[in-house]
Amino acid sequence: MIYTLYYIHDPMCSWCYAFKPTLEKIKIYLDSNIKVVNIVGGLAKHSDEIMSEDMQEKIENIWYEIEEVIGTKFNHDFWKNCEPKRSTYLACQATILARYENKEEEMIEAIQEAYYQKALNPSDKTTIISLAKQIGMDEKKFEKDLKSQKIEDDLQNELNFRRSLYVKTFPSLILKYKKELYPINIKY
């Protein structure tokens, strides 16, 4: 019998970034009959608007909290060097596109490294396209696919699936056995 462990995340979720070392340990110790499936959560819809100063301060404070509580480090230059947007759907779409080429984990890692360590903005198309190229995806095809109705539909389907799991916080883990779903408490 195959079990499914759903990992519900957003590639631009700072708590998901902090959870990465724990998730990697979980994957090492999982039985071979448990398949891990990533589901993007979609924290924030497409937007070109600059994030309000209040929201910027709130998110940067979350980064400080994570540094203090968990020890994960962030490059706070992001808040000085970038024009932050409250928009993660583009990063979610990039993750799905990378999945189609078996590069999902590389894309998640590239997005998180760019955002949290290199102070780059994954809500900008130029950044996302350069990350696709960096992990070996065809730049032109990726850019074209990023604009397609198919990726928009695929993202909406994944967000609807996430909602059907009643997940409202990221990261989340849910184990599926037969038709039953079992939420798993997250520990860092």
Where are the regions that the model predicts?
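Structural alpha/beta surface segment adjacent to cysteine/selenocysteine redox centers
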Residues: 20-118
